[in-house]
Amino acid sequence: EFRRVLFRSEDIEQIMAIFTTAKEYMAAHGNKTQWGDGYPGEEILKTDIDAGNSYVIVNNGMIVGTFSFIIGKEPTYQVIKNGKWTDDRLYGTIHRLASSGIVKGIARACFEYCIKQIDYIRIDTHKDNISMQTAIERFGFHKCGNIYVKGGAERIAYDYIS
């Protein structure tokens, strides 16, 4: 049984360890550039905590995953190339989804939680992040096109309407 809870400042060390594990996994599976240059760092996590947007996924009392979920407009989603969003209504955005690698089902647990909060969700991922693309598509997200994050890096954009 998974449960999702807002994470607190005292969880930062564990979350940073999960991000390190996720980066190592991505690098070992052909995605060496998605989370480079120290991203995501503690400052981003603290900002997410202060805004009430960061969550941990807990299994048997252990933090096994993390994600950020924000309802409202995502600045990098204002321009989409090679396609379009399914709808233009209010949506939630999932960012920084990562797993400790200890248990399976972290992405699904995140998606199921988020879709209960709002019926329209958007997410993006790196073209080399095949594991995340698979999880996103397996859940039923629709590939919409390409967006560009801060710094100009391209991401594949998806949305889901329940």
What feature does the model see in each segment?
Residues E1-L6:
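Short, small-residue-biased leader/transition segments that mark boundaries at the very start
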Residues K23-I44:
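Conserved GNAT-fold acetyl-CoA-binding loop/helix
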Residues E43-V56, K73-P75:
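A short helix-loop-beta-strand connector motif used in the catalytic cores of GNAT acetyltransferases and
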Residues V56, M62-G72:
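Conserved beta-strand in the GNAT
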Residues S68-I102:
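Conserved acyl-donor/pantetheine-binding loop and adjacent beta-alpha core of acyl/acetyltransferases
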Residues S99-K116, Q133-R138:
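Conserved acetyl-CoA-binding loop-helix of GNAT-fold acetyltransferases
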Residues R108, D128-G145, A153:
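Conserved active-site alpha-helix within GNAT-family acetyltransferase domains
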Residues K116-D128:
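Conserved GNAT acetyl-CoA-binding A-motif
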